[in-house]
């Protein structure tokens, strides 16, 4: 595999070497911008918004990210809709594309990983990896500490419970929990009446 072709494989799910010089040069520029974002003061909201427009592939209106925010490519491959909220400590392993729909919330320390490594030790020792795009729908809520693995799609309005590890696609309009994450139930009329346990 020629090093000159490595960058082309970032978005194809093919194996590639992430230590390719072209990839690393671009990555470091992105990480410099991310560093600047994380060093902003809480009062520098306008500066944060300006940096977000430079960092992300796409960023909608009224998005808020609480530093520190971690990202392999500083958000370069992340596509954010409108009204998105990231709590502190969110990590996007954005070696390829991550799409997050309007009005979705990510709790503290959520990890969305697009990158994986071969099971075969002989390939892994050579530092090969592959990437698979992640899609998070509109109006989702991923609780604290949720981990989403490469190639996953989560449907609109779905809630993923804190600490869950999402290893398979999740449909829209469900509550899903656990490791591995499984659908607990559909969102229903009970949820219109009670917002938390017995609270109306």
Regions found by a protein language model. Give the residues of each.
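Terminal amphipathic alpha-helical/low-complexity segments used for targeting or macromolecular assembly
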Residues: 1-62, 181-200
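Flexible, glycine/small-residue-enriched loop-and-beta-strand segment within the central core
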Residues: 42, 68-80, 85-154, 179-181, ...
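Short-chain dehydrogenase/reductase
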Residues: 141, 159, 175-177
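Conserved catalytic segment of ABC-fold P-loop ATPases
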Residues: 155-158, 171-173
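Short hydrophobic beta-strand element within catalytic cores of glycosyltransferases
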Residues: 166-167
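Acidic, glycine-centered active-site loop in nucleotide-sugar glycosyltransferases
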Residues: 170-172, 177-180
């Amino acid at each position: 595999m020629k090093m000159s072709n490595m960058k082309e494989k970032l978005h194809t799910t093919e194996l590639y070497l992430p230590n390719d010089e072209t990839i690393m040069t671009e990555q470091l520029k992105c990480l410099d911008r991310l560093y600047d974002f994380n060093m902003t003061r809480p009062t520098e909201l306008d500066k944060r918004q300006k940096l977000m427009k430079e960092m992300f592939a796409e960023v909608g209106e009224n998005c808020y990210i609480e530093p520190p925010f971690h990202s392999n490519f500083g958000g370069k491959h992340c596509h954010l809709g409108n009204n998105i909220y990231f709590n502190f400590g969110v990590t996007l392993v954005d070696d390829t594309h991550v799409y997050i729909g309007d009005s979705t919330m990510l709790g503290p320390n959520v990890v969305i990983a697009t990158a994986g490594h071969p099971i075969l030790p002989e390939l892994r020792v050579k530092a090969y990896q592959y990437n698979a795009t992640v899609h998070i729908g509109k109006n989702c809520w991923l609780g604290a500490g949720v981990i989403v693995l490469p190639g996953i799609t989560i449907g609109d309005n779905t809630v993923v419970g804190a600490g869950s590890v999402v290893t398979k696609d999740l449909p829209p309009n469900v509550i899903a929990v656990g490791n591995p994450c499984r659908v607990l139930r559909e969102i229903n009329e009970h949820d219109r009446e009670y917002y938390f346990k017995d609270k109306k």
